[in-house]
Amino acid sequence: MRPRTKARSPGRALRNPWRGFLPLTLALFVGAGHAQRDPVGRYEPAGGDANRLRRPGGSYPAAAAAKVYSLFREQDAPVAGLQPVERAQPGWGSPRRPTEAEARRPSRAQQSRRVQPPAQTRRSTPLGQQQPAPRTRAAPALPRLGTPQRSGAAPPTPPRGRLTGRNVCGGQCCPGWTTANSTNHCIKPVCEPPCQNRGSCSRPQLCVCRSGFRGARCEEVIPDEEFDPQNSRLAPRRWAERSPNLRRSSAAGEGTLARAQPPAPQSPPAPQSPPAGTLSGLSQTHPSQQHVGLSRTVRLHPTATASSQLSSNALPPGPGLEQRDGTQQAVPLEHPSSPWGLNLTEKIKKIKIVFTPTICKQTCARGHCANSCERGDTTTLYSQGGHGHDPKSGFRIYFCQIPCLNGGRCIGRDECWCPANSTGKFCHLPIPQPDREPPGRGSRPRALLEAPLKQSTFTLPLSNQLASVNPSLVKVHIHHPPEASVQIHQVAQVRGGVEEALVENSVETRPPPWLPASPGHSLWDSNNIPARSGEPPRPLPPAAPRPRGLLGRCYLNTVNGQCANPLLELTTQEDCCGSVGAFWGVTLCAPCPPRPASPVIENGQLECPQGYKRLNLTHCQDINECLTLGLCKDAECVNTRGSYLCTCRPGLMLDPSRSRCVSDKAISMLQGLCYRSLGPGTCTLPLAQRITKQICCCSRVGKAWGSECEKCPLPGTEAFREICPAGHGYTYASSDIRLSMRKAEEEELARPPREQGQRSSGALPGPAERQPLRVVTDTWLEAGTIPDKGDSQAGQVTTSVTHAPAWVTGNATTPPMPEQGIAEIQEEQVTPSTDVLVTLSTPGIDRCAAGATNVCGPGTCVNLPDGYRCVCSPGYQLHPSQAYCTDDNECLRDPCKGKGRCINRVGSYSCFCYPGYTLATSGATQECQDINECEQPGVCSGGQCTNTEGSYHCECDQGYIMVRKGHCQDINECRHPGTCPDGRCVNSPGSYTCLACEEGYRGQSGSCVDVNECLTPGVCAHGKCTNLEGSFRCSCEQGYEVTSDEKGCQDVDECASRASCPTGLCLNTEGSFACSACENGYWVNEDGTACEDLDECAFPGVCPSGVCTNTAGSFSCKDCDGGYRPSPLGDSCEDVDECEDPQSSCLGGECKNTVGSYQCLCPQGFQLANGTVCEDVNECMGEEHCAPHGECLNSHGSFFCLCAPGFVSAEGGTSCQDVDECATTDPCVGGHCVNTEGSFNCLCETGFQPSPESGECVDIDECEDYGDPVCGTWKCENSPGSYRCVLGCQPGFHMAPNGDCIDIDECANDTMCGSHGFCDNTDGSFRCLCDQGFEISPSGWDCVDVNECELMLAVCGAALCENVEGSFLCLCASDLEEYDAQEGHCRPRGAGGQSMSEAPTGDHAPAPTRMDCYSGQKGHAPCSSVLGRNTTQAECCCTQGASWGDACDLCPSEDSAEFSEICPSGKGYIPVEGAWTFGQTMYTDADECVIFGPGLCPNGRCLNTVPGYVCLCNPGFHYDASHKKCEDHDECQDLACENGECVNTEGSFHCFCSPPLTLDLSQQRCMNSTSSTEDLPDHDIHMDICWKKVTNDVCSEPLRGHRTTYTECCCQDGEAWSQQCALCPPRSSEVYAQLCNVARIEAEREAGVHFRPGYEYGPGPDDLHYSIYGPDGAPFYNYLGPEDTVPEPAFPNTAGHSADRTPILESPLQPSELQPHYVASHPEPPAGFEGLQAEECGILNGCENGRCVRVREGYTCDCFEGFQLDAAHMACVDVNECDDLNGPAVLCVHGYCENTEGSYRCHCSPGYVAEAGPPHCTAKE
């Protein structure tokens, strides 16, 4: 648990801990008992405690009106952050109710003030404006008891007394400073006028503005740009969106804005109407387009100016405004939305929230009340799966992971509270019938809203996601009491229980404000939009004149202030700015003017929204952006309503930048082994874990991959670009690829099929009735046909038609259509319950009976000769278009008369009465009537109740007093000191009583106080008196006990107990006792109360040579020292004569007994070791004979010096002298040589040193020379002439012994990523690459099936989509239809292709003919290469075949009719055998890898794709497209072996180093292996001194100059090895023969055993019968003896080196046998080849049947011919040539092949003899 920290407000310490706020929960209620409630259900004092200012329609009361009470059970505190002028003086009687006009006039306090601490979120009055004082009723001068009198305009009174500290001038605060609340320190700056728009006062007269504001008092709104979450584009923030006071009604939920402009300076507030068009006319036309997921707000923050103005760069709490519950709530302007993509918010599992609550309360003392606000701890909460509860803070926070549309509110993790006009899980469905109530979701949220709590809603981005234009948004809802405010600091996503590093949500690039953020965003739900002619003109920003018809250049964005990315063709300004352009111009480019959110007719001109253009004076037509050239590079453009989207072709997908299409092979999830080397026909050196081909081949690590050993493609080839589109060193993660899909909504899945057309999409069905729609081919909208948005049925869908509409000739006033449009008029049926176009066929037709269902909607249709008229039902009115009936908003007439909140409903309304009123219903009329609270019992207990309008007040009786809550409270007379001076005062309602005190008490000031008896002398003698309430108690001293009445102490007779003095005589005394006459071995203790044992061991001299053990009354000597033993009596230790013991010995000396030990007297030159052995004296341990330039080595009776480099031995080898290197030759080329002690110096520049190889001055690698001390735990990086220290290995890496950071291969766990994907290790992490049809799970550790039916919109058109494992099927609902995959819809059976009568009978198609399929590779003769056998013509010619059949008929070309007949579904698709449904053949993707087998991709692995396949070459191979196969890649041409010799092999290479260079970790560089042992701690772990002579078990004559391994020492001139003098095996022993590998070869050669040519012989596993360790436990190794040559065999191995060979003919009666001979494996070893013996690698029996190559981190093996490397065991295993070369018949014709160790033998059949050439047997001649 992290320590609790205390947040501090400016200038005062937090005095009350945050734990005091524990009672907070999701639905806490403040304790009742207050006199009355304010209009939103909160309690407030009665009468004149506060004047209530009201908002129209039940808005929040003014901040000055609401008295909010805390949870601390103290006197309640007023709202924090209010100016003193806002706290009205109390008065008697009822408050004056504002008139209707006044109630409708929003006050300044209503507009700008919130219940929050002043230093945090208070909004001040703008510069130059005065806050209107609340209207108060005149109150009598009589003040109320306990209520402070406050001046209306007086500033905060400074504390009394003289101030000290900072900013103090003359005992008072300096100008510009004031004291902070509850402190006496002048640390609070003053800004007059105050900072506006929630700006904070940083220093005197210096405001720090929030984002989006500027000015000296933050009064100016910055014309910045905000990302529109709904339309997924950056749009200019208009006046209605910038206002900090913007509110949206939560009851209506239809997008209506209710806000007021700021009042003019010095003028009272006046009612304002919202500007026209502030919300899009179709912003909520269909909820399915309001996608929820990624969203982002991008704001530009200005820098500080010269006017002492500061600007905050902090990210604002969210794209919308803070939301509080109550009757009116502020919600974000738009619903958070995302492109058509996966809803990433659903995958959020664990979220962290960092917030700070603020608590305000009022404390009153001595008639003075003070307001105190304190900030709680900055608290971090975690939410698992959407719910979180922190027991420390008492908060319960939930996250809304679902979208609540149409004004709905999230009340749980997966639950929305919907308004009256919508229903569904997301509030996305309209109410089916106007008179039907919403589904039962009202009870719980309604009770929630009426609770005396506040709900704060914050919409914030997840702060630890990667920065992008569309970060995930999370809505955080917090319910809390009104006196608390919450500030959210951070919302971060936590993965896997570990808190990841945070990433700032910043966007450095600025896209154009009206360009779609990404492909896939659709701005409108219909291709046609009407202009709203019934609304006032909407003010638009001034735009440059647009000359019609003038063509110019259209630019998409700007780069460094210059227009960039122009389109390929010239366009008009309207076409450019209305579609994808951001700038336009002919000679000079200018920004495009902003577009309206919906069609608006202004000054007779039609302004169309983004993505639409004018069709005529009243219609806007969708712009087909896909006609613009170059819009979707390497992708297909799909036009949408008001926008477009780019989709990649099959087999491709968008890369993470969403700017280009890459092959889906780049995120293949298939895993396999990655091989670092290739041998002849096989892969070698595989990595330990399976990885993807991308990781293997794109990272330069592997040469081949997969079970088929597929060679990695060469860089620059098409195959390389497919899997590595980003080049070497980069791969794509599947999580980086966003599929251009979205989940279908519930109503879309249940929607009936609709016809498909040529265009992208049509209108969606209406909410009232579901009926098929037609796809719009050329759509437009008419002005004046959209119903009012107040209608609950409006704003859902705009039905589109495919032709021009007929005009209503009734009351609709619209211009006629052109004649050419009228000529095409046809009858059209349209659902009237949605936003429709009223269409007619021809005049004279009865429209009311033309088949449409209730044309007028909620009304009666009256047919007229030239049209029709609608007579609306009660509660409805005629729409301004005169075409149908819409809901009448009765609330505009205030039917509730200011006594309640009016909620308009479809065809009716409802009054929600304020507290103090009750609802009275009379027919269709509702009104609020006053409640007579005085009729309720106990309302004014102790007083008289007087009812008032909407409230009541109490007149208190005698003995009672009016409290601030409006109740009569009994006066406690007992509080006065003079009441009952000689007794106890008992208060009673309205009076009191005096009672006499009990015993032990006395009267004092009306109370009975305890008498302290302990003050009386003599009480509790021999004890301690403890006063009790009304009595006392005695606690006795030791030796005394309490009397029975506990009022005294008496002596205890300790001698009465046998436990006292058990070993002596007991004598009782007063309060104690004494012991005497103790037994033998005991003595009396110091206090005389016991006979204690006498510890003899404490006396000196007892057991001097042993351990004295004390016993009861005695002691004994035990555990005698070495050389001593206990005496017979056990009371002493006596000496032992060790020289008498035959087991004791003094090896090499004379034994002499001593007291407690013995001595070994050694001869001269030896010294005693271990007390028993005389060893040679090590002179090197004494004086430094060879120091300081040599190392002293002891010898038998002497020593010699091993001189350091640069010194030579002198004086008979007993000293070292310096060698002057500069005297011989100048070793410093390009520098000056200076001889030094033991060396020389080349004078070079700082940071450089002479190279030991060239003598030139080269850079000093400080990191290598000095190692870890240079940078400690950090990583050292060398630089020319210097070095730098950087942080060590990053997470996901571990440090290798050489200091390199090596990636941790998480994919070592085979279960990672499951069975439908494979793990792809990346640098520092890993990713799961899933198979086709699968996607990565939310955990990221496995692959799950992709439900294409949910993610792909209308993938099967009108057919039913059925998801299957890894794919999906399209099924028609009717058995009489079949799905046409080419056209994408269901059609009647037999409509195309073969008719039903022609279809074959039965359920299966006839079996096709199968023959051989031939490839057409270059360099091969036609029909010479069989690609596959037993294939059909479709399987051959529709895939990779060139010809087919016995006649080798050529396959038709792809553009021929014959090819279309054989392959109707195209190349890569073949008919499904047996799938014959109603006469139609089903086609599927051809799996070429299965059809043609391994022959399709030799030296590689075949991977099937849809359609086609790819060859994943083995490591060391690359794909040759011309030959269609994997060919060997010559790594030696890529400089794969640095400082060594590279030898290319089939599929791999070998790097050989010249001594003393060895291979490094990469296996591609030779480096110096003679580094210091400090750099290589385990490099020479098996290197030590080699001793040439061993005498008397003493090693002598060490091998001078270097150290060796155990095998090197014993097999050359040594007899013992290492400091432990490990003896070598005898040279005549079998162990020596095995160790040095010499005698065995000679013995076997003498026995006539011949060895295979080209191979060096080494012992096998069966030959090692001796212990694998030497005598001292050190390992010994095989040693390869000198190479030898013997006569060549009769049949040489074809893989060996060619030479003249003479056949050896055996007896004709016996089968010939090939017997290999021992020859040199490399007649001429290549230069740089490290021909090391196995033991030189410092390994144990390693690399048998091969050479050991020692590298820095260990060793590797180069196997002899006939053997191959088993990388798992690092051993060379035999190659079975008889099975490896396609069977023994190839090797031994007319005989049989027998495999041998490292070779093989051919046994010829009778009548055949061995042939000298190929390994065959020929007939005898």
From Swiss-Prot:
Biased composition regions of type Basic and acidic residues, renumbered to the chain: 744-757
Compositional bias ranges of the Low complexity kind: 108-120, 129-145
Post-translational modification summary for this protein: N-Glycosylated.
Expression by tissue: Expressed in the aorta (at protein level). Expressed in lung, weakly expressed in heart, placenta, liver and skeletal muscle.
Principal subcellular localisation of the protein: secreted
PANTHER family xref list: COMPLEMENT COMPONENT C1Q RECEPTOR, EGF-LIKE DOMAIN-CONTAINING PROTEIN
Name of the protein in question: Latent-transforming growth factor beta-binding protein 2
Species name: Homo sapiens
Record lineage: Eukaryota, Metazoa, Chordata, Craniata, Vertebrata
